[in-house]
Amino acid sequence: SLGSVLYNYKTTRKVNLKMMLEHTKSVRMGVKKSLLVIDLPYNTYRNKSEALKNSKRALKETNCDAVKVEGGVRVKDVVSHLVKNKIPVLGHIGLTPQTVKGKFKSVGRTDRERKRLIRDAKALEQSGAFGMVLECVYSDISKKITKLIRIPTIGIGASVHCDGQVLVTDDILG
């Protein structure tokens, strides 16, 4: 959301780690009791060592509580490595803004998409993620995933069936 909401970028890929660190530091000044998760930007977790280096830096410099990475099966080894190194990880599946090609659209309409979402959700859970964001996932598959896994699901346009919801103030106010 940082790139699109605050900078009016057409893609989140323009957001870099330095930008995320500065904004997360600012948020930390106001957030005292809530869990604060930093979104690792595109190309900052391409492999385990890069992910660990950038995650450690993010936690140290911002005093945030966890990192968020996009992807399921394709990032499971990175997630496992971070968790083994005591970095709490929030996963993110469904519509993944860092890798979306073309227009944003809901995910989980076809059997193939549904099966991929379930595989991704299970992979994140098995890798040790403490929760996952489901973005723009059809209601029935969000409900199925939420019942299937034991970690919390947080929906962004993914129905009332998730355990929690993300509400972007700028989206609400227009």
Can you say where each PLM-predicted feature lies in the sequence?
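Alpha/beta enzyme core
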Residues: 1-174
